[in-house]
Amino acid sequence: CEDTRVTAKLLARYDIQKPLLVYHAQSGKLATTRVLSLLGEGKHIALVTDAGTPGISDPGSALVAEVRERLGDDVRIESIPGPSALTAGLSIAGVPTNEFTFLGFLPHKKGRQTLMKEIADMSRTVVFYESPHRIEKALAELDTALTAADMPERKVTVMRELTKLYESVVSGTAAELMEHFKAHPTEVRGEFLVIVSP
């Protein structure tokens, strides 16, 4: 699990009493080695994420890759999907979903401007995650890229806290959404999903 406090609440809710092993982006090889050892002993392991589906923009994907590489077909990996902002957002956005590009979290600095230009040039739905600290900057960069590509009217949908108590969805151009968040600073909290229409 990423955070024992979060996972412990879930397990307590269903009266499940099992030992927890922390695994996150900074866990390093020690946690991976422990998981491989437990699997080698025939133990069953559950990969639990704090939010969303394990392995989707989540450090769990590296663990699954390592298990597959080291143990191959000797271990059975099953998916029990949880809520995912990616699929939940696409299902209510009203955009083409037969073909889309998912970028996960955008880089903080290096390559970000180039990526925004690539997003503007894509002719399919584009989806990415953004943090509350960078959502306004992302919308400004997206507006610049779409304007440079002569597509400033392209529809953008920003979804916040999907499947949670303070869920909200706003749509418009990138420029309109920038104004929206400036006018509603209390909405610049939580986890964001950004969907750019083709």
Please tell me what each predicted stretch does.
Residues 1-78:
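Class I S-adenosyl-L-methionine
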Residues 1-19, 79, 87-95, 101, ...:
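RNA substrate-binding interface of SAM-dependent RNA methyltransferases
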Residues 2, 77-82, 128, 158:
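General beta-strand structural signal in soluble alpha/beta enzymes
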Residues 4-5, 22-29, 83, 103-108, ...:
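Short, acidic/turn-prone active-site loops that include or flank metal/cofactor-
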Residues 17-25, 77-78, 97-104, 149-159:
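Short hydrophobic/aromatic-enriched beta-strand-loop microsegments
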Residues 33, 58, 89-91, 113-114, ...:
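Short, well-ordered secondary-structure micro-motifs
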Residues 40-44, 125, 129-198:
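A contiguous loop/helix-start segment that scaffolds small-molecule binding in enzyme catalytic cores
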Residues 62-122:
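Class I SAM-dependent methyltransferase SAM-binding "motif I" and its flanking Rossmann-like core
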